[in-house]
């Protein structure tokens, strides 16, 4: 293996799990999330020599993943694919084991958030440091903390609504 391949392997191992969760947060589908994960890391591989070290590499990869997910969602919307309906979401939720039901419900709630909120909360769930999230989001760290608080309140309301159904 040459140096680029070794570096890429380390980058993939360090970031793939978090990127998968990010992609899953956008799609709610394992297969689509895996496809987006592969597409993201293909772009990382193709552009690794263009990385300028002005930010953490994980920040750069998150940006690529977010853009890849957004492109995917726009394409899905244009193709008129079925949106997640309450019935489809319920079917998906039943596929999860009882242990994962709450996680599935949380992702369902996350999918109802605005795009910027989904990005932020997914990064928080992946335990990305706040300064890095602020950089990815393009907002100050103080503003980020306020947004996270509001997103958590919104998620709590959504979660409680769905739990009552």
What are the functions of these language-model segments?
Residues 2, 41-56, 75-76:
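Sigma70-family region 2
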Residues 40, 64, 120-121, 133-134, ...:
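Hydrophobic positions on the alpha-helical face of helix-turn-helix-like DNA-binding modules
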Residues 21, 35-42, 55-67:
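Structural recognition of an alpha-helix C-terminal capping motif at a helix-to-coil junction
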Residues 50-52, 63-83, 99, 150:
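Arg/Lys-rich amphipathic alpha helix in sigma70-family domain 2
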Residues 70, 137-161:
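DNA-recognition helix of helix-turn-helix
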Residues 71, 78-103, 129-130:
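Internal acidic/polar
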Residues 1-21, 34:
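A short, charge-rich alpha-helical start-of-domain segment used by transcription regulators
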């Amino acid at each position: 293996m040459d140096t680029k391949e070794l570096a890429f392997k380390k980058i993939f191992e360090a970031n793939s799990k978090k990127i998968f969760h990010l992609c899953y947060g956008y799609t709610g589908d394992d297969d689509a999330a895996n496809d987006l994960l592969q597409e993201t890391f293909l772009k990382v591989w193709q552009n690794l020599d263009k990385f300028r070290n002005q930010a953490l590499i994980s920040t750069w990869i998150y940006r690529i993943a977010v853009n890849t997910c957004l492109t995917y969602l726009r394409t899905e919307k244009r193709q008129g694919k079925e949106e997640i309906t309450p019935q489809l979401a319920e079917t998906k939720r039943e596929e999860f084991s009882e242990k994962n039901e709450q996680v599935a419900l949380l992702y369902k709630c996350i999918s109802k958030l605005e795009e910027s909120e989904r990005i932020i909360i997914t990064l928080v769930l992946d335990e990305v440091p706040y300064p890095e999230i602020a950089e990815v989001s393009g907002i100050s760290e103080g503003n980020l903390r306020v947004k996270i608080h509001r997103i958590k309140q919104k998620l709590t309301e959504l979660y409680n609504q769905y739990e009552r159904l």
